[in-house]
UniProtKB/Swiss-Prot annotation:
<feature type="topological domain" description="Extracellular">
    <location>
        <begin position="19"/>
        <end position="21"/>
    </location>
</feature>
<feature type="signal peptide">
    <location>
        <begin position="1"/>
        <end position="18"/>
    </location>
</feature>
<feature type="topological domain" description="Cytoplasmic">
    <location>
        <begin position="45"/>
        <end position="74"/>
    </location>
</feature>
<keyword id="KW-0732">Signal</keyword>
<protein>
    <recommendedName>
        <fullName>Uncharacterized protein YOR008C-A</fullName>
    </recommendedName>
</protein>
<dbReference type="GO" id="GO:0016020">
    <property type="term" value="C:membrane"/>
</dbReference>
<feature type="transmembrane region" description="Helical">
    <location>
        <begin position="22"/>
        <end position="44"/>
    </location>
</feature>
<keyword id="KW-0812">Transmembrane</keyword>
<comment type="function">
    <text>May be involved in the regulation of telomere length.</text>
</comment>
<keyword id="KW-0472">Membrane</keyword>
<keyword id="KW-1133">Transmembrane helix</keyword>
Length: 74
């Protein structure tokens, strides 16, 4: 799981920088790719984490940012 994300990130990061010249858009695009990792990094029970990641995939970017912000404040 982690290896596939890292390989994907390794190949996608240069393309994101090419397609998104504006730094804000670039950082949002990178965050949108990295954000599913937050579910696995956060201290959630294993069975809850699988359910959360399935629900997490349906969130918009704004909702992901709000969730990430609330998790980092705990």
């Amino acid at each position: 799981m982690w290896r596939s994300y890292l390989v994907f990130l390794f190949f996608m990061t240069p393309r994101i920088q090419t397609y998104c010249p504006v730094p804000v858009l670039r950082s949002m695009a990178v965050l949108n790719i990295i954000s599913p990792l937050i579910i696995f990094v956060s201290p959630i029970k294993k069975q809850d984490s699988l359910h959360s990641s399935a629900c997490y995939a349906n969130l918009t970017l704004v909702e992901k940012l709000q969730l990430w912000h609330s998790m980092s404040n705990d």
